[in-house]
């Protein structure tokens, strides 16, 4: 199995110039290895002897290197030999990956051999700004609460901000069924193994799985794999975009990626500065998120989930991500407790490309819907205690009358898909008749 792993990662001995650099492990911790290994570069792959365990250089101090292993550090000890391989980690990409499940390093998890694929570096540079095509076309998700007031565009990057247990996974499954996408890349980071299997087998339809590449790094995997999973998924999505495809990338979750990156950074000696996160975590986010979006030919529409602690939407990580993305969808615990799914807080949800990808009629209807919800929320407490008096404000009276129909419109089962024509028709029926 280890020999197959080396072959899949395209690692052959000796390195191309015939010169091998050897070193030895000097210190072993739960997360990182400290080795004497002069001449290495950041991101270089290393092989730990006498086995073929792989590790990556994540820090350099003179002749010493900090290595993050691909597997657990259990069983490793001081004095073991380390060989620098003079190459970086490459991941498989290609059409043959559709319908497959791979781990955070690109190795198959579904019991089948890796097909003939191309190989790319995991950390490509984002497309230059002037090479990208502008966002002009809508990407309809089939979810009324999104398409009605926060329509997404092809190539947009959206954050889904949610506390645990309010329907985030179900919403992701609904987004996987987006009718306007040619292919999907789904990455699950830090999830429980049981939930991963149930999500793939029971939440995703068979048709969706056929056009989806699934990257999985469960919570028990090493921190490097949990970090690398998002890079692997982004690299695969870039391959499809560069071939002119409309790709939907769904990442669950960006928070667990950041926590894994924090684990490595703190072990490497970085100091936490903002919200217990080292500066390296925040500096890596823009480069990673900018890799998605529009390209010269195709597009990557990306949805990143962000876990918020205690429903605090202004915590440092959530605030930083919101500033980098092109929109945000906020899930409400209050709506979930009422059995309102998807539990999307329409008034807190925003798409920055909404004015560009929708018609004037659509924008007018969305504004009316938002105003009705806002007016109802202002007097909701008065209604519940019986103190509201009708006739004082006609706009508020209308908002109260249409509120039940609006709630029915915004609710949707996970198997239901609403087309754009039916969406506008229903909005007309609720808001103008």
Curated annotation (Swiss-Prot):
Top-level division of the source organism's lineage: Bacteria
Family named by the database record: Belongs to the ATPase alpha/beta chains family. T3SS ATPase subfamily.
An annotated Gene Ontology molecular function: protein-exporting ATPase activity
Physiological role: ATPase component of the type III secretion system (T3SS), also called injectisome, which is used to inject bacterial effector proteins into eukaryotic host cells. Acts as a molecular motor to provide the energy that is required for the export of proteins. Required for type III secretion apparatus (T3SA) formation, secretion of a subset of SPI-2 effectors and virulence. May play a critical role in T3SS substrate recognition, disassembly of the effector/chaperone complex and unfolding of the effector in an ATP-dependent manner prior to secretion.
Pfam short name (any one): T3SS_ATPase_C
Phenotypic effect of disruption: Deletion mutant cannot secrete the effector proteins SseB, SseC, SseD, SseF, SseG and SseJ. Mutant is also defective for the secretion of the translocon proteins SseC/SctE and SseD/SctB. Mutant shows decreased virulence in the mouse model of systemic infection.
Gene name for this UniProt entry: sctN2
Catalysed conversion reaction: ATP + H2O + cellular proteinSide 1 = ADP + phosphate + cellular proteinSide 2
GO term, biological process aspect, one: proton motive force-driven ATP synthesis
Entry protein name: SPI-2 type 3 secretion system ATPase
Enzyme Commission number(s) from the entry: 7.4.2.8
Oligomeric and partner information: The core secretion machinery of the T3SS is composed of approximately 20 different proteins, including cytoplasmic components, a base, an export apparatus and a needle. This subunit is part of the cytosolic complex. Forms homohexamers. Forms a complex with SsaK/SctL (stator protein) and SsaQ/SctQ (the major sorting platform component). Interacts with the T3SS-2 specific chaperones SsaE, SseA, SscA, SscB, and SrcA.
Broadest EC class assigned to this enzyme: translocase
Binding-site positions, ATP: 165-170
Localisation per UniProt entry: Cytoplasm
Keywords: ATP-binding, Cytoplasm, Nucleotide-binding, Protein transport, Translocase, Transport, Virulence
Cystines in this chain: none
Organism placement in taxonomy: Bacteria, Pseudomonadati, Pseudomonadota, Gammaproteobacteria, Enterobacterales
């Amino acid at each position: 199995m280890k020999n197959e792993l080396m072959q899949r990662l395209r690692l052959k001995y000796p390195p191309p110039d015939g010169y091998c650099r050897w070193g030895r492990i000097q210190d072993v911790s739960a997360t990182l290895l400290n080795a004497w290994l002069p001449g290495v570069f950041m991101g270089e792959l290393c092989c730990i002897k006498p086995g073929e365990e792989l590790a990556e250089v994540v820090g350099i101090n003179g002749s010493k290197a900090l290595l993050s292993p691909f597997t657990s550090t259990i069983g490793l000890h001081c004095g073991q030999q380390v060989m620098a391989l003079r190459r970086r980690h490459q991941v498989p990409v290609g059409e043959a990956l559709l319908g497959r499940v791979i781990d955070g390093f690109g190795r198959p998890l579904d019991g089948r051999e890796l097909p003939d694929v191309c190989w790319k570096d995991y950390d490509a540079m984002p497309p230059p700004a002037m090479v990208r095509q502008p966002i002009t076309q809508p990407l309809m998700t089939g979810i009324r609460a999104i398409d009605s007031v926060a329509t997404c565009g092809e190539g947009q990057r959206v954050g889904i901000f949610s506390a645990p247990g309010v329907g985030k996974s179900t919403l992701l499954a609904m987004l996987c069924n987006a009718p306007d996408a040619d292919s999907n890349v789904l990455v699950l980071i830090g999830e429980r193994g049981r939930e991963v299997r149930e999500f793939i087998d029971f939440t995703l339809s068979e048709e969706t799985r056929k056009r989806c590449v699934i990257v999985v790094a469960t919570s028990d995997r090493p921190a490097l794999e949990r970090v690398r999973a998002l890079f692997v998924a982004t690299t695969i999505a870039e391959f499809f975009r560069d071939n002119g495809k409309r790709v939907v990338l769904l990442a669950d979750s960006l928070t667990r990626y950041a926590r894994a990156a924090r684990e490595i950074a703190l072990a490497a000696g970085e100091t936490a500065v903002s919200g217990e996160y080292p500066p390296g975590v925040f500096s890596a986010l823009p480069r990673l998120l900018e890799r998605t979006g529009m390209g010269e030919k195709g597009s990557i529409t990306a949805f990143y989930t962000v876990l918020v602690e205690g429903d605090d939407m202004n915590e440092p990580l959530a605030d930083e991500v919101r500033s980098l993305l092109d929109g945000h969808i906020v899930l409400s615990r209050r709506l979930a407790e009422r059995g309102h799914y998807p539990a999307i807080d329409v008034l807190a949800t925003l798409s920055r490309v909404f004015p560009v990808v929708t018609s004037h009629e659509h924008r007018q209807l969305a504004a009316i819907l938002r105003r009705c919800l806002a007016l109802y929320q202002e007097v909701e407490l008065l209604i519940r205690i019986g103190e509201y008096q009708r006739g004082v404000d006609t706009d508020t009276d209308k908002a109260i009358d249409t509120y039940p129909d609006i709630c029915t419109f915004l609710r949707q089962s996970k198997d239901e898909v609403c087309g754009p024509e039916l969406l506008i028709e229903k909005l007309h029926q609720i808001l103008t008749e």
